[in-house]
Amino acid sequence: VLAVVETAWLFTRGTQSVRIIRAATMDGEFHLHVHGPAAARQSHVFHDVIDCMRYQADLERRLVGQGFALERFTGDRRRTPRRS
């Protein structure tokens, strides 16, 4: 699955970090990848951008409630398919 647009958020708390990456694909799916804290990894697939954004907002509220703060935002990183 090729990602068309990626947006990333980095949350930190002390030496811990959580990176959230939202990717839209050419087939209309929305992927939410959560890396951290530590070696934890999760991936979620949504067929509706609103559902994806709601899940992400809830996740961000939980992170802030646990003492994480938004460190960095990277928006609209367009990817092009690699040629073989």
Predicted segments with their positions:
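Short aromatic-glycine-(Arg/Gly/Cys) micro-motifs in beta-strand/loop hairpins
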Residues: 15-42, 61
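The feature represents the first ordered module of a protein
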Residues: 1-18
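Short glycine-rich, low-complexity/disordered patches
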Residues: 65-77
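N-terminal helix initiation/capping motif
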Residues: 78-79, 83-84
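A short, charged, amphipathic alpha-helix used as a generic interaction element across diverse proteins
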Residues: 47-65
